[in-house]
């Protein structure tokens, strides 16, 4: 079986277009990987399994009907400072509580237009004021190559 987490985005797109993988298979692999490593890394603040799989199924149906898009069916996690309509927007802070964004940021609109699956929010420094996630209300993230180190700064 293909180790989805080790593929580049171009390789994922090639396998999707070639029918070697479905969006659902990729999404399931991503969710399984998150479940297996995020306890150590603390990279994700939140993600919605049901919504992610539903989006993957929609992408697979679209592809089966001949639709295409540059990112159709590719999972994308979003930094917790970018607005996604009807999803929590914390900016890695407890101060915003359960705030739900009433709109999509322009980058989210563009990703959706390209067919991307927006499925999770990733950790960062509170209000993007730092470079190590040590100041996140959700705890620090860890470097996936060596968990004794910070994963580094911002985008």
Would you name each region that the model predicts?
Residues 33-37, 55, 59, 107-110, ...:
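Short alpha-helical functional segments enriched in proximate histidine and acidic residues
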Residues 50-57, 115-116, 125:
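Long amphipathic alpha-helix in the N-terminal Rossmann-like dinucleotide-binding domain
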């Amino acid at each position: 079986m293909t180790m989805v987490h080790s593929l580049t985005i171009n390789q994922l797109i090639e396998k999707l277009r070639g029918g070697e993988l479905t969006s659902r298979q990729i999404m399931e692999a991503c969710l399984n990987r998150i479940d297996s490593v995020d306890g150590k890394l603390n990279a994700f603040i939140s993600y919605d399994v049901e919504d992610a799989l539903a989006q993957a199924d929609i992408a697979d149906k679209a592809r089966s009907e001949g639709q295409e898009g540059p990112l159709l069916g590719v999972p994308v996690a979003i930094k917790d400072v970018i607005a996604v309509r009807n999803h929590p927007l914390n900016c890695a802070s407890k101060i915003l509580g359960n705030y739900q964004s009433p709109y999509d940021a322009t980058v989210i609109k563009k990703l959706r237009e390209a067919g991307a699956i927006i499925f999770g929010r990733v950790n960062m420094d509170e209000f993007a004021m730092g470079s190590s996630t040590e100041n996140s209300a959700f705890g620090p993230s860890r470097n996936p190559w060596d968990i004794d180190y910070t994963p580094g700064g911002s985008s």
